[in-house]
From Swiss-Prot:
Belongs to the peptidase M54 family. Binds 2 Zn(2+) ions per subunit. One is catalytic, whereas the other seems to have a structural role. This is Archaemetzincin. Keywords: Hydrolase, Metal-binding, Metalloprotease, Protease, Zinc. The gene is amzA. Monomer. Probable zinc metalloprotease whose natural substrate is unknown. GO terms for molecular function: metallopeptidase activity; zinc ion binding.
Amino acid sequence: MHVDIVPVGDLPAVVKREASSGLRSVYDCEVTIHDSQPVPDGAYDSGRDQYRAEEFIELASRVGNGEKNIAITDTDLYYRRRNYVFGLAYLSGKGSVISTHRLQTSSDGGFSEKSAGDIFADRVRKEVVHEVGHTLGLEHCDNSRCVMNFSPTVREVDVKEENLCGSCQRQIL
């Protein structure tokens, strides 16, 4: 499998590096980094002061060169009635997106002894692996340690692991 990371806006090299590392580690796939793209026209909702996540998925699907493509942005994303999302993907689709905007809080609430930079890097890897998992047909998993577990807050992101549980692994083999 080939995954193309599509940076949207000015994305730090560390984010691209961590995203690539997480995907390679979990899915044993080829990963490329696409040229940076501007924020999609029409994605901004001035009433919410946020961006529509669907627009970023469409961008990744359109410009990405991979079998699976993931847009990564630092803009604040929402989807439908949700206040915000860390990421979004269509089940078995070609494109997905994650936002680092709400992953950048400095602490994991004492869950670990890691630095803020390491905590952020872990969150990026987990969310990229999670969203690409959806494009591979994986739904949310009930196992709280599985990367495919639904994580509405950074606390849940911090608690889960970067890897797929055995059940989810078997589904994509």
